[in-house]
Amino acid sequence: ALVTQSNAPSWGLGRISNRQAGIRDYHYLSGTSM
């Protein structure tokens, strides 16, 4: 959730929206990273 933010700016926006849910952040990057 720190190295993918610059690699995936699209999911980054969603991460900011779900910043309250840190666990959801991992799910987001996991789906885009893989």
UniProtKB/Swiss-Prot annotation:
Recorded GO molecular functions are: serine-type peptidase activity
The yes or no answer to whether the keyword Secreted is present is yes
Provide the primary localization: secreted
What is the protein named? Thermomycolin
Its EC number is 3.4.21.65
The annotated dependence of activity on temperature is: Thermostable.
One GO biological process term is: proteolysis
Q: What function is annotated for this protein?
A: This is an extracellular proteinase with a general specificity for apolar residues.
Instruction: Report the domain of life of the source organism.
Output: Eukaryota
Taxonomy of the source species? Eukaryota, Fungi, Dikarya, Ascomycota, Pezizomycotina
User: Where is the protein found, in the record's own terms?
Assistant: Secreted
Which residues are responsible for catalysis?
Answer: S33
The reaction(s) this protein catalyses:
Rather non-specific hydrolysis of proteins. Preferential cleavage: -Ala-|-Xaa-, -Tyr-|-Xaa-, -Phe-|-Xaa- in small molecular substrates
Q: Could you tell me the keywords of this UniProt record?
A: Hydrolase, Protease, Secreted, Serine protease
Give the family per the record.
Belongs to the peptidase S8 family.
What Gene Ontology cellular-component terms does the record carry? extracellular region
